Amino acid sequence: MILFVGFLLMEIVMPQISRTALVPYSAEQMYQLVNDVQSYPQFLPGCTGSRILESTPGQMTAAVDVSKAGISKTFTTRNQLTSNQSILMSLVDGPFKKLIGGWKFTPLSQDACRIEFHLDFEFTNKLIELAFGRVFKELAANMVQAFTVRAKEVYSAR
């Protein structure tokens, strides 16, 4: 009985990913990199395509294609944009029952900021989670590092 209860508890806990980094770039610079969805395939590991479906000053709907080890999926999010401060994502379409999260950019000085990335997600079913779960978790867990490396490439060249 205890094993069964433990199994049920494991089933209802959604995977969460949280990453934080202190970077020698402004909040504005980091916000611009993260909000530049169309450039994702150039530097995000596993990202094979991205497109903006709708865009207004405070909101963007974008689709991102991810592929790894022969497994490909597309997901679409609606992003609430607070310029140079935060990007809040919510699921529109994709292999998830739930996907919410976002980015927060906190200035530390003119040339440094703290970036925070948080994601809560749950796949639509166990089969999709078995096929794609590890790939997606790995991609999501490496997002902050990928953007930090990208910032160095883009802003150190100036």
From Swiss-Prot:
Top-level taxon of origin: Bacteria
Coiled coil (UniProt feature): none
Something else known: This strain of E.coli has only 6 recognizable intact TA systems, whereas E.coli MG1655 strain K12 has at least 16. This may explain in part the differences between the 2 strains.
KO phenotype (gene knockout): Deletion of the pasT-pasI operon yields a defective infection of mouse kidney but not bladder. On rich medium operon deletion decreases bacterial persistence after antibiotic exposure about 100-fold. Forms small colonies on rich medium. Delays growth on minimal medium supplemented with threonine, increased sensitivity to oxidative and nitrosative stress. Growth defects are complemented by low levels of PasT expression.
Pfam families: Polyketide_cyc
Encoding gene, per UniProt annotation: pasT
Family: Belongs to the ribosome association toxin RatA family.
Matches recorded under InterPro entries: COQ10-like, COQ10_START, START-like_dom_sf
Function in brief: Toxic component of a type II toxin-antitoxin (TA) system. Binds to 50S ribosomal subunits, preventing them from associating with 30S subunits to form 70S ribosomes. In this strain of E.coli low levels of PasT complement operon disruption, however high levels are toxic; their effects are abrogated by high level expression of cognate antitoxin PasI.
GO BP term, pick one: cellular respiration
Residue ranges of the region described as Required for resistance of nitrosative stress but not persistence or toxic effects: 70-158
Description of how the protein assembles with itself and partners: Associates with 50S ribosomes.
Alphabetized GO MF terms: ubiquinone binding
Keyword annotations of the record: Stress response, Toxin-antitoxin system
Protein name: Persistence and stress-resistance toxin PasT
